[in-house]
Amino acid sequence: MQNSPIPSPWQFIKENIPLLMVALVLALLLRFFVAEPRYIPSDSMLPTLEQGDRLVVEKVSYHFHPPQVGDIIVFHPPELLQVQGYDLGQAFIKRVIALPGQTVEVNNGIVYRDGQPLQEEYILEPPQYNLPAVRVPDGQVFVMGDNRNNSNDSHVWGFLPQQNIIGHALFRFFPASRWGQLGSFTFVPARTIINT
């Protein structure tokens, strides 16, 4: 029995170029149209997301339905931030607080949506600022970071056009100790205690 000659590295590459090209095209299609990895560069989403976390952002679902309250989204900066020097290629990550037609207000450390106080168990601390009631226009959303007092978000620059949304942050894959699905948070109006 004879041993087959070992192919040269060049011959191996030449024989596998079509396979490598198909793999590259598939990887690029997935990256640009289905999902992409993202790195968290700031503390604006503490305690939900920490600086250095790495996420998978899916890009398909918002083509079939709009974002929902509680979704954590990744988006390109709106026009006001671009005027301030942010590049359109940069990405932000925040939580959707209100949808078109809803009102948002921040008063005495409480966020209100449509006049109802929100019970926000995921925030780092209550906001130390006030925001008069504003109505979200059609085609836009109101977003806030979970680290309310250290977040450049809609309370600073206004509404986010839905066309700026890149995708929905679904899964943290790094660090391994915090690995898991992010999901959406269901907002529950705060309970009012009435003393009788």
Curated annotation (Swiss-Prot):
SUPFAM superfamilies: LexA/Signal peptidase. GO terms for biological process: signal peptide processing. The keyword Transmembrane applies. PROSITE patterns: SPASE_I_1 (PS00501), SPASE_I_2 (PS00760), SPASE_I_3 (PS00761). It is a single-pass type II membrane protein. The active site is at S44, K94. Belongs to the peptidase S26 family. GO terms for cellular component: plasma membrane. It comes from Synechocystis sp. (strain ATCC 27184 / PCC 6803 / Kazusa). It holds the Pfam family Peptidase_S26. One of its GO terms (molecular function) is serine-type endopeptidase activity. The chain crosses the membrane at residues 17-35. It comes from the Bacteria. It catalyses: Cleavage of hydrophobic, N-terminal signal or leader sequences from secreted and periplasmic proteins. It is found in: Cell membrane. InterPro entries: LexA/Signal_pep-like_sf (IPR036286), Pept_S26A_signal_pept_1 (IPR000223), Pept_S26A_signal_pept_1_CS (IPR019758), Pept_S26A_signal_pept_1_Lys-AS (IPR019757), Pept_S26A_signal_pept_1_Ser-AS (IPR019756), Peptidase_S26 (IPR019533). Residues 1-16 are cytoplasmic. The lineage of its organism: Bacteria, Bacillati, Cyanobacteriota, Cyanophyceae, Synechococcales. Its EC number is 3.4.21.89. Residues 36-196 are periplasmic. This is Probable signal peptidase I-1. Keywords: Cell membrane, Hydrolase, Membrane, Protease, Transmembrane, Transmembrane helix.
